[in-house]
Structures are given as structure tokens and as C-alpha cells.
Amino acid sequence: YAFNTDTYEEIFTLPVSQVGGKKYYAVTFGDVRLVVLYVTNMWRTPSLAPNARGKYKECDRTLNTPENWGYGQHIFEPIQPGSTQYQWLESELNSVEFKQAKYKVVMLHHPLHTLGDNIVPAYTNPRQIIERDADGNITAVRYEYPKEQDYLSRDIVPLLEKSGVQLVLYGHSHLWNRFVSPNGTHYLETSNVGNSYGAALEEKQRPVPNGYQEEYTSIGDPYGLDPILPAIAPLFG
């Protein structure tokens, strides 16, 4: 989860867009129009331990040295409306190449629907909250991520579904997930594993903070879709 993509771009021969370079682009393979987005952020631990510099808080021992703060799970490339990438995506979804494609596929890193841990907190810029004692000394620095400001669920998902995208492919949580939205868009999460071990389902919960201003979903898909779970039933007729 590094901001520097130079090595990746040097190793792989990638399509290039005029605006996004090798970071986000679109290409046609036969009947498929593939749109690749640059949607990723700085991964930080969800731990609330005193020595943790995580997505929800700063390390206690660095409270008075802001130059050592991590500033939460910040986003590498803007994707919200008005950003360069969002405007490029709008243009691509309205292009002749996209509209004429039989199959419309979008690929990105961050999940849109998942049972995995990494969809929480919301994909939005962290909101810093500094707590002080009566003498003005910093006692805590924490970060909130308002769910209603999630750029992906609020802005990107409606845009993709309205444009007729049939499949959205992503990774990040290192498990296998499949969802289908009411309008028929398929959401598939996969990586180097073909199982759903570690999914936040039933007794397994995500590590989320309690007592914060925002509520962070510990079980299930935070954005309301039921998973289509893998089964061996079809093998038995």
C-alpha cells in the first residue's frame, strides 16, 4: 500500500491514459471494455493499543510531535466528484468504446462490497479529532470516517450501475466474495486465495472501535448486500 508506483509501472507493460497515465486507464479486449481505477489508501492497523499508530488513532508517545503522526488511513488519489479521476471516469463511461462494448468491467483495488476487514472504515478522507485536557495538553488524536461521506458507495457505485457496468472486480481483503446488486451488477472480490476464511460473518467480527462518534460495521457487508456464498451443492446435481 505504497504511494510510489514506479516499480510496478516499470515492471509491467500497461495501457496508458492521457490523464491517469498507467494508474487509471481503459482498454478493449474483444467484446470487453475494461476500466481500471486507482482506488487505494494507506493501510494502517485497526489496533487501539497505546503504542499503535493506526487508522483510528495516533500513538500515545507521539502526541506532542505531529511530524511523527500518520494522519490516519488517507487516500492516495482523489476519486470524489470534481476530482481529475472522477471526471475522467465520467468521460470514459460516456465514450463510444464503453457504450458499444458487450461486456463492461471495472477493476480497482478497494472493495465496494465485502465481508472482509478492509472495507471499514469508510473510503473517505479521515476527519482528525484532537482531545485536550483542562491545561490544553493533547491527550488523544483520533480519526473518524463518516459513512455517509464514503466516496465509493455514495458516488462511484451509483455511477457505475447507472452506466450499465456488469462486473466490478477488486481485492484488498484477501478472500473470495461475490455480491449482486438489485439492478444486476456483479461485485467480485478475489486475490491469491479462493476461500472466504476470515470473513466478518456470524461469530467473526471486524476489529472496530467502540465509543467513537461514527458507528463502524463489525459484521457483514457495511453497504447492505447479502453475499452469494460458495457451495459444493452443484457438484451433486
For each feature predicted by the language model, list its residue ranges.
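Metal-dependent phosphoesterase/phosphodiesterase active-site architecture
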Residues: 2-106, 111-237
